[in-house]
Every structure is written in structure tokens, then in C-alpha cells.
Amino acid sequence: MLAALSFADASPTANKWRIEFDGQALKTGEIQFRLTPRQGEPTDVTVSIRSGRAENNVAKDVRDAFAAKLSPERYTVEVDDGEDILIKKKEGQPDFSLELVDSDVQNVSIKIEGE
């Protein structure tokens, strides 16, 4: 499994993050993310992924989990290009870091990039 990991004490911040997924889940598992606004409290997001889910469906599952957990007054969460998720701060909100904490979903690679 490929994963882009960053550490809390050195996490860069950005106004928008892209999460790219590739592959099909070979077994049911969970993906755990942490979003931390600059000088703010972290929000952990855990996403359950069922076996057999392709990258586009994994992206939708992750989008839905972030949308349910994050305030719509502070962030927008959308699917982009089918297999990518974009998380953007709204105007007036602080930049934030995004990190992959853990994943036990086999055969799904996850890449996180600030934009």
C-alpha cells in the first residue's frame, strides 16, 4: 500500500487539499484522516470502506465522511475527476493541514497534496 503521511509537528498548511485514490479495495477496512486548522483543534475522520469498492466509490465514501464531520460554514468537500477529493477552506477561514493517520484498506493507494 502506498500512503502519503505527514506528522502533526511538521504538517504544512494550505487552503485546499487533494486526496487521490487508486485501486480497488481487496477487503473491508478503515481509512483515518486528521484535519487541523492553523492554531485550531484537530478533527479526526474515519471512513469505513467495503471490500470490492473501486477508487471512484472510495472517493465518494471519503467525501461523504468528511462532509458529515466538517462544518459546511468552514469547508467545502467535493469529488473531482471521479477518484479525487478536494477539501477547501471557505473565505475567512484559516489554512489547515491534512494527514493520513492510518489505513488498513488493501490495494487502495492514497496520495495527499496541498494545492
Predicted regions and their residues:
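Hydrophobic h-region of N-terminal signal peptides that target proteins for export
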Residues: M1-A8
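Polar, low-complexity export/assembly segments characteristic of proteins
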Residues: S11-E115
